[in-house]
Swiss-Prot record:
One of its GO terms (cellular component) is cytoplasm. Belongs to the PRA-PH family. Its EC number is 3.6.1.31. This is Phosphoribosyl-ATP pyrophosphatase. It is found in: Cytoplasm. Keywords: Amino-acid biosynthesis, ATP-binding, Cytoplasm, Histidine biosynthesis, Hydrolase, Nucleotide-binding. It catalyses: 1-(5-phospho-beta-D-ribosyl)-ATP + H2O = 1-(5-phospho-beta-D-ribosyl)-5'-AMP + diphosphate + H(+). GO terms for biological process: L-histidine biosynthetic process. CDD domains: NTP-PPase_HisIE_like. The lineage of its organism: Bacteria, Pseudomonadati, Pseudomonadota, Gammaproteobacteria, Pseudomonadales. Pfam families: PRA-PH. Coiled coil: none annotated. InterPro entries: HisE, PRib-ATP_PPHydrolase-like.
Amino acid sequence: MSDVLERLAQVLEARKDADPDTSYVASLHAKGLNKILEKVGEECTETLLAAKDAEHSGETRDLVYETADLWFHSLVMLSRLGLGPKDVLDELASRFDLSGLEEKASRNP
């Protein structure tokens, strides 16, 4: 499963410095972090709305689509900041032996 994320991370990294006129990812980077964060926020809202719709209708196609957009733009954000999916997956893996309450208590204030 993480192979897809790793391949996507490689593509995002390669397109970071591409021509903004020919690459959506490059155009986001050219506009700066605030534009990338704006897109993450927009996709987050769309994902939340799709989840509400899915709960009422039972149809999940839009939820999956919007979640993919959210993940994509989150990966662009991570790339901008020198991080990638491995950093997030490593963090998730480190939480496997903790209960949710233990993990929350271990966070720095």
